[in-house]
Swiss-Prot record:
GO cellular component, one term: plasma membrane
Matches recorded under Pfam families: ATP-synt_B
Keywords noted in UniProt: ATP synthesis, Cell inner membrane, Cell membrane, CF(0), Hydrogen ion transport, Ion transport, Membrane, Transmembrane, Transmembrane helix, Transport
Gene of this entry: atpF
Compartments where located: Cell inner membrane
Keyword match Nucleus: no
Family annotation (InterPro entries): ATP_synth_B-like_membr_sf, ATP_synth_b/b'su_bac/chlpt, ATP_synth_F0_bsu_bac, ATP_synthase_B_chain
Any GO MF annotation of the entry: proton-transporting ATPase activity, rotational mechanism
Signal peptide: none
Disulfide bridge map: none
Protein name as annotated: ATP synthase subunit b
Length: 185
């Protein structure tokens, strides 16, 4: 549109009738131009009020939402980083606690094993001592039985030998003496 006005201005300077001719050729009537300008301003006002202004408001609202979303995303990133650090600290603490529990369990198991070993050794020693006592008792009983049997055999043998050569009173004294001797053994 600007070149048209420039051309009209040049033509008016060069030839005054040429502008009127151009205005007539293009149908430029000041009354119509004023009406068109007024109509354009009305349409522009309606468009601004009902189309452009709500669109700008929606765009600003959307920009605010996007800004709030970005801010929220940054906050969430910070919270995520903090949560990751916290979870890493919790995992590390849990690992330390688990190691401590495992070490304590090992120590308890070792103590229990040592205690059980000591108890088993004590029971074995006690069983061995009881077995030795039983063997000793059995040995004494066997010796006593053997002494009794030997004494009986000696008495019988002595009776047979002495029955032929000794008198009854000598035999009784000899039997009593032999019995005393065997009892002391």
């Amino acid at each position: 549109m600007l070149p048209l006005f420039l051309a009209a201005a040049e033509a008016h300077v060069a030839e005054p009738g040429l502008v009127a001719e151009l205005v007539e050729k293009f149908g430029l009537d000041p009354k119509y131009i004023l009406i068109q300008t007024f109509s354009f301003l009305i349409v522009l006002g309606i468009l601004y009020r009902f189309a452009i202004k709500p669109t700008i408001a929606a765009m600003e609202e959307r920009a605010e939402k996007v800004g709030a979303g970005l801010k929220y995303a940054e906050e969430m990133q910070a919270k995520l980083a903090a949560a990751q650090q916290e979870s890493a600290a919790i995992v590390k603490k849990s690992q330390v606690e688990a190691s401590r529990i495992v070490d304590e369990a090992r120590r308890t198991a070792k103590d229990y094993l040592d205690k059980q070993t000591q108890e088993a050794a004590a029971k074995a020693s006690e069983t061995i001592a009881k077995a030795q006592q039983a063997i000793e008792l059995e040995h004494r009983k066997m010796l006593a039985d053997a002494r009794t049997e030997i004494a009986r055999l000696v008495v019988i043998t002595t009776e047979r030998v002495l029955a032929q050569k000794l008198s009854d009173s000598d035999r009784a004294a000899y039997n009593a003496s032999a019995t005393r001797e065997l009892t002391n053994v």
